[in-house]
Amino acid sequence: MQQHALYHPVSIGPLSLKGNVFFAPVAGYSDSAFRSIAIEWEASFTYTEMVSSEAMVRDSLNTKRLIRRASNETHYAIQIFGSNPAVMAETAKLIVDSAQPSCIDINAGCPMPKITKTGAGAALTREPTRLYEVVKAVADAVYAQDARIPVTVKIRAGWEEAHLTWKEAARAAVDAGAQALALHPRTCAQCYAGEANWDIIADLVQCARGWGEVPVFGSGDLHAPEDARAMLEHTACAGVMFARGAMGNPFIFRQTRQLLTEGYYTPVTFEQKLRAAWRELHLLAQDVGESSACKQMRKRFVSYAKGERGKTQWCQRAVHASSFADFAAVIRDACPCIGL
């Protein structure tokens, strides 16, 4: 595949996107603050963290906050999880009415026991029949309200190595009305250990071509722009979804676009990292308040400082920061050229 063709527009049903480098849903990170930063650094498409269908129908205030669109999000997807088709359908209708997202994504890939024990997340990949019922209910509900909003599904390779059900799950999702698929090619048993098997993504791409040219997006072991290029070349997937690789590193989206289109990318300075962290803190505070934002930002600051000399000292202070002033002091000491 020619390098210039690796970065390109993509369509998910009626939804047209200018690029194919996405920010995946990440629990505890994919809030509107970080999504906004990711968009500033050229993420082509962004997803909310997964939203509980049960909490949504209970009218949870926290859940309503999770689905809020960032101010600079032209397009975004809301990811929902659950195992009850009726509840999932009701959740989808509520979301379409209240948030008007560009896409609704169904989580059939989360490996966390607290999710799978309810029959949701990766447990749906293990049970293609149940997945079909969930996707069909959601798709029917969404398309009846607004046919411009595609329903998509993210799956895993399977429950364990001896039971790889990705093909059956993917086909069930498409037959039920899903207009795109995303695949994390690890099993639920692996969680995030070991290597992601990109060969499975390539196999799914081939299968999906026979199901009506359904686009397939890949995730797993994407930690650098070079990883994205390698996945696109190896699998011929329609696009890539950065998850953990984007934590504290929203710059990876622009760098990946540069690598795919120009063959090189511009390194990010420590000052740029700290300025992005400071901006994220303030965006987060607009949503949850200064105190809560500072608590959440502690671990995120550590991610921003990854790979920098002297990070241990700054991070030790950052994990105890409880105010804007505390973070400003840490940032000024780490990079005096930043005038805060």
Swiss-Prot record:
Enzyme class, first EC level, given as a word: oxidoreductase
Domain of life: Bacteria
Keyword Coiled coil: no
Record-listed FMN binding positions: 25-27, 79, 154, 219-221, 243-244
Signal peptide: none
EC number assigned by the record: 1.3.1.-
Matches recorded under Pfam families: Dus (PF01207)
Catalytic activity: a 5,6-dihydrouridine in tRNA + NAD(+) = a uridine in tRNA + NADH + H(+); a 5,6-dihydrouridine in tRNA + NADP(+) = a uridine in tRNA + NADPH + H(+)
Keywords attached to this entry: Flavoprotein, FMN, NADP, Oxidoreductase, RNA-binding, tRNA processing, tRNA-binding
InterPro entries the UniProt entry points to: Aldolase_TIM, DUS-like_FMN-bd, DUS_fam, DusB-like, tRNA-dHydroUridine_Synthase_C, tRNA_hU_synthase_CS
Cofactor(s) required, per the database record: FMN
Active site: 110 (proton donor)
Any one GO molecular function term: tRNA dihydrouridine synthase activity
Entry annotated with the keyword NADP: yes
Described purpose of this protein according to its UniProt entry: Catalyzes the synthesis of 5,6-dihydrouridine (D), a modified base found in the D-loop of most tRNAs, via the reduction of the C5-C6 double bond in target uridines.
Listed PANTHER family: TRNA-DIHYDROURIDINE(47) SYNTHASE [NAD(P)(+)]-LIKE
Family in the record: Belongs to the Dus family.
Protein name: Probable tRNA-dihydrouridine synthase
Source organism phylogeny: Bacteria, Pseudomonadati, Spirochaetota, Spirochaetia, Spirochaetales
Gene responsible for this protein: dus
